């Protein structure tokens, strides 16, 4: 064990220190030990959401992972076992896109030509390359930031065992009759040509500008036109009908000059007005109901199609409204959900001249190969040239984009498999109410509303690399056939799959036999599973070719990571539901939803009990980070520059996690200077004197009751801190806990306890008081290291290890293996804390007033006045009066009850923000009454929290929050107040000649102490001092000679008039008086 505690340089490199601690954790296997240590409270279950295996970690991941790490470290210290299994999301488009780029494949058809088997082999190789070689990506971020998660045995969504568990879940849902195939209008990603689920769709909305056009459809039986509005001109090619509201009032209007007649909803006549003053251009010539228009034929806009079914006539739809447009909707069944449902009612034809890649087909040669959104402009131009375009505008609205390819989504009629989540929506809503959401409004609002508006889950995907949908169908299967039809079934395990058949070298054989003989290797992916068929009741069943939504993969991780139900049943029962999860706000419609939906579908339980949602990270100006803006923050560069601890602390303390976070380097540096420097300086202060005195905490504890009031106060405050931080952590209020620790470290420990205890450490002998000071400060530092450990694991570990290297009371190998501190109620003295808090507040107020007046703290002043109108307030102040006088450097404290305001003047100002909503039109009259409130009325309002004001016979109750109370300075005095703690203080700013002399002496001491430090003297070294100065300065020195010698450890002082012959540094000014100081180490 070293003989001395290590000291930290003022230029401590946080990055280098963190590297040292990481090495310690690895060498000692500390993370593994934290998982294996005694856990008397059992398992605290945490689920890690799987990142995309080939994704790049960003600063937002540092944010979410800090939250996870803080909570998990805290519960480990609280006596729980907290398994933390990492995971990899390995299926779907992110991997496929990378493989396509590597192989030079441009689209889906290219992949099919290349070969699905070879393509998926490349995908698997890519996945495991990233898993095995992640030191520069996720692994580097995880280790560098101090995030403890088990990356040695992660769950991998493309693993056979994982897929088997997913298949079990799908079969369970299928057997409940909740998986079905249907033909619907679905949102589709045209780039990948695959369906998007509602939760995927929610991830990609953007603000865009689209055309807003009014089109004239000419009726066949007259020269009149029906006016229709649309924001999707490209769909007009597929128009087959116009829908009106059966009971909506429509009008025929005639243009007074041209004679043109248009038909539209009467309540939408305003759309005809192109310019101000055009109202009179049109006149109403007839009115009718929408039902009167039903069945009328019109001329198609384009002549590309000759459908067998009747088309291009007016129909009635109950979805038609007059909230926008013209009250008439153009119907293109292939591209709209309402349109499609209406087409089934009227047997309308479906014109679908757009391929799944979003491009027009050869059916419309004028636009063949053109992307659907790119066709808007040429179509509008054509309609304008043909006289069919009435007006063109631009509209700004939100529109969904592919969350992976960033291209506009197309709503498209196609077959797809669905999970009937609408059947369980009420149950999902009910279970959601049992979850503790942080913040609550996410659970009741964004997430709750999403559940209320639930749509069936579009499950299937027509891609290549993913979990195959384990449904086998007969050749005569058709949409509408259910599990009881005998035409389809689901496979839920490898054992069931082994019952199928496979062809090998032209020979058909049982799959189980083939596997047992080593003729094939099991791979639950395409194309292997597509080779397997079943024979049941004489029918052949082949697998439906689709994959499933990758979000089902990640939502299955609570059980699939354990290969449940095939093994680990007992462990699953202990870890489900999760006690805690945390991710970004965008996951409310992503992972949070899929976890919740699958858990409800299978287990009828929520998947998690507590969730912390983090907001987005923005740049320092509040802008979204993007490569194009050049404002993306590199997490590795930031951690190298500031250290991971500083960024973790900054992300936690600035605001609650769910609020948008501005990443501001200047604020990170400020937290380093404020909090980290206070903690390190407190440690350095301790070891500076402990090394001199050889303190190792080997002596018996000084009893708490025998310690000084200052020691008892800081220990009481420390135990109150433990209780309050623990309470905040149990409520998942991480920011509140962080701020409590920060305030205690800076305000109570560094700026108060240590500063007021300095003289006790300077004492030569190790008496009971000095020993008590050492033991108290050592205890505070050790306890703070524990409280800080979840938030700033590196610096907490560093100080813990360095304290433990010489002395201390804890034997834990690491602070992260130590137990969380428990508040000792017997040490808490609320009254002592309260009066010391008053002393701190008064000190702060007086120092602020000194700064305002330009008077240094070292300049003594005569007195302060404290308002003591409340019962018992004077007695409380008198208990800490000596401390206050010493801190603010005044000679005395006087007390006033000041009910009439003769000494301390108060004024009341109305708070319109609270008055307005409560008093409405009476607010102005009430504000005038508030402005003329007397001092006594204001004091009563402060004491009682409310006051009644007669407003012309009407009694109004004014609350404390309705009034801003300001305190006005009086001549020769400055006044300040802290309303929250009901403290008001006035400072006498007059400086007499006697006070000025005392101020000179104090300033001299400060300069001498600086010179001692610059001369390289030890803190215990005695000195011989020479002061040369002006007569006024020497007079001040003579008057305070004993004080100067005691403070500077001087054994002698020589006072000389100033001339150029004296040794020492150059002449300087001390409070405008010339002075030259010199000192040398004294032998005695």
Swiss-Prot record:
GO terms for biological process: isoleucyl-tRNA aminoacylation. A motif ('HIGH' region) lies at residues 51-61. Its EC number is 6.1.1.5. Monomer. It is found in: Cytoplasm. The keyword Cytoplasm applies. HAMAP family: Ile_tRNA_synth_type2. This is Isoleucine--tRNA ligase. GO terms for cellular component: cytoplasm. Its cofactor is Zn(2+). The keyword Cytoplasm applies. It catalyses: tRNA(Ile) + L-isoleucine + ATP = L-isoleucyl-tRNA(Ile) + AMP + diphosphate. It comes from the Bacteria. It comes from Chlorobaculum tepidum (strain ATCC 49652 / DSM 12025 / NBRC 103806 / TLS). Keywords: Aminoacyl-tRNA synthetase, ATP-binding, Cytoplasm, Ligase, Metal-binding, Nucleotide-binding, Protein biosynthesis, Zinc. The lineage of its organism: Bacteria, Pseudomonadati, Chlorobiota, Chlorobiia, Chlorobiales. Its main location: cytoplasm. It holds the Pfam family DUF5915. CDD domains: Anticodon_Ia_Ile_ABEc, IleRS_core. Gene3D superfamilies: HUPs, Isoleucyl-tRNA Synthetase, Domain 1, Valyl/Leucyl/Isoleucyl-tRNA synthetase, editing domain. GO terms for molecular function: aminoacyl-tRNA deacylase activity; ATP binding; isoleucine-tRNA ligase activity; tRNA binding; zinc ion binding. InterPro entries: aa-tRNA-synth_Ia, Anticodon_Ile_ABEc, Ile-tRNA-ligase, Ile-tRNA-ligase_type2, M/V/L/I-tRNA-synth_anticd-bd, Rossmann-like_a/b/a_fold, tRNAsynth_Ia_anticodon-bd, Val/Leu/Ile-tRNA-synth_edit. IleRS has two distinct active sites: one for aminoacylation and one for editing. The misactivated valine is translocated from the active site to the editing site, which sterically excludes the correctly activated isoleucine. The single editing site contains two valyl binding pockets, one specific for each substrate (Val-AMP or Val-tRNA(Ile)). ATP binds at residue 627. Catalyzes the attachment of isoleucine to tRNA(Ile). As IleRS can inadvertently accommodate and process structurally similar amino acids such as valine, to avoid such errors it has two additional distinct tRNA(Ile)-dependent editing activities. One activity is designated as 'pretransfer' editing and involves the hydrolysis of activated Val-AMP. The other activity is designated 'posttransfer' editing and involves deacylation of mischarged Val-tRNA(Ile). Belongs to the class-I aminoacyl-tRNA synthetase family. IleS type 2 subfamily. A motif ('KMSKS' region) lies at residues 624-628.
């Amino acid at each position: 064990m070293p003989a001395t505690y290590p000291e930290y340089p003022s230029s401590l490199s946080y990055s280098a220190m963190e590297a040292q601690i990481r090495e310690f954790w690895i060498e000692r296997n500390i993370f593994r030990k934290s998982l294996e240590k005694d856990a008397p409270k059992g398992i605290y279950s945490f689920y890690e959401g799987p990142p995309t295996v080939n994704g790049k970690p960003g600063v937002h991941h540092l944010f979410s992972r800090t939250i996870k790490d803080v909570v998990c470290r805290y519960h480990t210290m609280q006596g729980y076992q907290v398994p933390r299994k990492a995971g990899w999301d390995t299926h779907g488009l992110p991997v496929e896109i990378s493989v396509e780029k590597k192989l030079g494949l441009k689209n889906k058809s290219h992949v099919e030509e290349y070969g699905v088997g070879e393509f998926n082999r490349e995908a698997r190789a890519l996945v495991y390359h990233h898993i095995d070689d992640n030191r520069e990506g996720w692994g580097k971020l995880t280790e560098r930031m101090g995030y403890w998660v088990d990356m040695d045995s992660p769950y991998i969504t493309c693993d056979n065992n994982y897929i088997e568990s997913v298949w079990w879940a799908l079969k369970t849902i299928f057997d409940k009759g909740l998986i079905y195939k249907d033909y619907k209008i679905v949102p589709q990603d045209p780039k990948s040509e695959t369906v998007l689920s509602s939760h995927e769709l929610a991830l990609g909305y953007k603000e865009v500008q689209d055309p807003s056009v009014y089109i004239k459809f000419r009726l066949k039986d007259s020269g009149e036109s029906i006016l229709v509005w649309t924001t999707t001109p490209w769909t007009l090619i597929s128009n087959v009908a116009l829908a009106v509201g059966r009971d909506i009032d429509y009008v025929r209007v005639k243009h007074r000059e041209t004679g043109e007649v248009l038909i539209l909803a009467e309540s939408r006549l305003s759309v005809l007005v192109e310019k101000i003053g055009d109202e009179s251009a049109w006149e109403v010539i007839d009115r009718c109901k929408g039902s009167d228009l039903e069945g009328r034929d019109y001329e198609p806009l384009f002549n590309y199609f000759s459908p067998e079914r009747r088309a291009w006539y007016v129909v009635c739809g109950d979805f038609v409204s007059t909230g926008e447009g013209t009250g008439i909707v153009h119907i293109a069944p292939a591209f709209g959900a309402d349109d499609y449902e209406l087409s089934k009612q009227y047997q309308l034809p479906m014109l679908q001249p757009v391929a799944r890649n979003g491009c027009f087909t050869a059916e419309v040669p004028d636009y063949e190969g053109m992307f659907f959104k790119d066709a808007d402009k040429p179509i509008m131009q054509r309609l304008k040239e043909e006289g069919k375009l009435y007006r063109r505008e631009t509209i700004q609205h939100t529109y969904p984009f592919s969350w992976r390819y960033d291209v506009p989504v197309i709503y498209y009629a196609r077959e797809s498999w669905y999970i009937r989540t609408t059947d369980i929506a009420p149950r999902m809503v009910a279970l959601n109410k049992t979850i503790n959401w942080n913040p609550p409004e996410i659970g009741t609002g964004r997430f709750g509303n999403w559940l209320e508006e639930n749509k069936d889950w579009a499950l299937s995907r027509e891609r290549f690399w993913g979990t195959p949908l384990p449904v086998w169908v007969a050749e005569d299967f058709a949409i509408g056939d259910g599990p009881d039809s005998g035409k389809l079934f689901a496979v839920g395990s490898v054992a069931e799959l082994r019952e199928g058949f496979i062809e090998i070298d032209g020979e058909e054989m049982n799959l189980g036999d083939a596997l047992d003989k080593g003729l094939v290797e099991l791979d639950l992916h395409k194309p292997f599973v597509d080779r397997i068929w079943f024979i049941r009741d004489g029918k052949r069943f082949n697998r439906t070719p689709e994959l499933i939504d990758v979000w089902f993969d990640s939502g299955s991780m609570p059980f699939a990571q354990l290969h449940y139900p095939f093994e680990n049943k007992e462990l699953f029962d202990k870890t489900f539901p999760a006690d805690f999860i945390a991710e970004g706000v965008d996951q409310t419609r992503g992972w949070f939803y899929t976890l919740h939906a699958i858990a409800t579908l299978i287990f009828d339980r929520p998947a998690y009990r507590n969730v912390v949602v983090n907001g987005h990270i923005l740049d320092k100006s509040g802008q979204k980070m993007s490569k194009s803006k050049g404002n993306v923050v590199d997490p590795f560069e930031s951690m190298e520059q500031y250290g991971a601890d500083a960024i973790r602390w900054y992300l936690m303390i600035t605001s609650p996690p769910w609020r948008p976070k501005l990443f501001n380097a200047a604020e990170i540096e400020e937290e380093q200077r404020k909090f980290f420097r206070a903690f390190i300086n407190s440690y350095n202060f301790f070891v500076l004197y402990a090394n001199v005195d050889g303190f190792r905490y080997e002596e018996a504890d000084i009893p708490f009751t025998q310690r000084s009031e200052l020691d008892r106060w800081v220990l009481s405050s420390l135990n109150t801190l433990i209780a309050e931080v623990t309470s905040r952590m149990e409520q998942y209020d991480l920011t509140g806990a962080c701020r409590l620790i920060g305030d205690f470290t800076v305000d109570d420990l560094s700026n108060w306890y240590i500063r007021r205890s300095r003289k006790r450490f300077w004492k030569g002998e190790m008496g009971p008081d000095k020993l008590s000071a050492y033991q108290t400060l050592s205890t505070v530092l050790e306890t703070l290291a524990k409280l800080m450990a979840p938030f700033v694991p590196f610096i907490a570990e560093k100080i813990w290890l360095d304290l433990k290297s010489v002395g201390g009371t804890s034997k834990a190998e690491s602070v992260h293996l130590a137990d969380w501190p428990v508040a000792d109620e017997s040490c808490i003295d609320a009254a002592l804390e309260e009066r010391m808090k008053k002393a701190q507040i008064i000190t702060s107020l007086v120092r602020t007033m000194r700064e305002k007046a330009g008077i240094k703290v070292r300049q003594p002043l005569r007195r302060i006045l404290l308002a003591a109108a409340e019962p018992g307030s004077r007695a409380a102040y008198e208990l800490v009066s000596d401390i206050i006088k010493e801190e603010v450097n005044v000679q005395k404290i006087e007390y006033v009850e000041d009910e009439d305001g003769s000494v301390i003047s108060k004024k009341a100002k109305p708070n319109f923000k609270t008055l307005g909503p409560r008093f409405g039109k009476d607010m102005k009259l009430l504000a005038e009454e508030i402005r003329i409130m007397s001092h006594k009325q204001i004091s009563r309002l402060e004491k009682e929290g409310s006051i009644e004001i007669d407003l012309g016979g009407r009694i109004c109750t004014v609350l404390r929050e309705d009034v801003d109370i300001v305190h006005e300075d009086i001549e020769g005095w400055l006044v300040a107040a802290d309303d929250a703690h009901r403290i008001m203080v006035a400072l006498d700013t007059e400086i007499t000649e006697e006070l000025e002399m005392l101020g000179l002496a104090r300033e001299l001491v400060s300069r001498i102490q600086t010179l001692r430090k610059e001369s390289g003297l030890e803190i215990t070294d005695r000195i011989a001092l020479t002061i040369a100065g002006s007569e006024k300065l020497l007079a001040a020195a003579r008057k305070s000679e004993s004080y100067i010698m005691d403070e500077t450890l001087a054994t002698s002082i020589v006072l000389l008039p100033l001339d150029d012959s004296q040794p020492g540094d150059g002449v300087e000014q001390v409070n405008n008086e010339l002075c030259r100081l010199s000192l040398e180490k004294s032998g005695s």
